[in-house]
A protein has these predicted regions:
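N-terminal low-complexity, acidic/polar interaction/targeting segments
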Residues: 1-183
């Protein structure tokens, strides 16, 4: 769980269609493909495509739950832009989706509709508080050290893609670097 002291609300609450993710976490600035099979998730993605293409992606606490409710979702997720939906061939109804994470958001609650075909969440985008000036030098040193450790890893790792190495080395903020490496 993210410590609430390190986050600040950056906008007013808004409502978005929601996809509960199993065993997957999406971060801001991350581009990812994954498959969706649950009817509510497919409907949420279709609703997003019919609207502004934005969807709230949030991990569910227990991956064995087939139809999670809001209390079974984590508090922090990501607002993402749906880039592409592709129906998978075969008998299953799975859809392959491509999304790009935009910003972190806090789940405030669910928006229940009588005939709701998908999860809809009331969310508020959040941003990290800036690093205090007295910790700035320490923060820079940690980023520098993390990059040095990554460079050491690249030397022993086989077939490390150049774009990943470049991406890590271009990050200067601790949060951005952590999101990039985690993603």
């Amino acid at each position: 769980m993210i410590d609430k002291e390190f986050l600040t609300f950056s906008e007013k609450p808004r409502e978005l269609p929601t996809v509960a993710l199993r065993g997957l976490v999406v971060f801001p600035d991350m581009f990812i493909h994954f498959e969706v099979g649950r009817e509510k998730s497919i409907n949420a993605l279709k609703e997003a495509m019919d609207g502004g293409q934005e969807v709230f992606l949030v991990a569910q606490r227990d991956v064995s739950v087939d139809d999670p409710d809001y209390d079974e979702l984590y508090d922090i997720g990501v607002i993402a832009k749906v880039k592409q939906l592709i129906r998978m061939p075969g008998k299953n109804t799975n859809i392959r989706v491509a999304v790009e994470g935009i910003a972190r958001a806090r789940l405030i609650g669910g928006v229940a509709g009588k005939n709701s075909k998908c999860l809809r969440s009331l969310i508020v985008p959040v941003s990290e508080l800036p690093v205090a000036e007295e910790l700035r030098d320490y923060s820079r040193a940690l980023v520098r050290h993390a990059k040095e450790l990554f460079a050491d890893y690249v030397e022993v790792a086989s077939q490390m893609p150049v774009d990943i190495v470049t991406g890590v080395m271009q990050k200067s903020e601790p949060g951005e670097l952590a999101d990039y490496v985690a993603g």
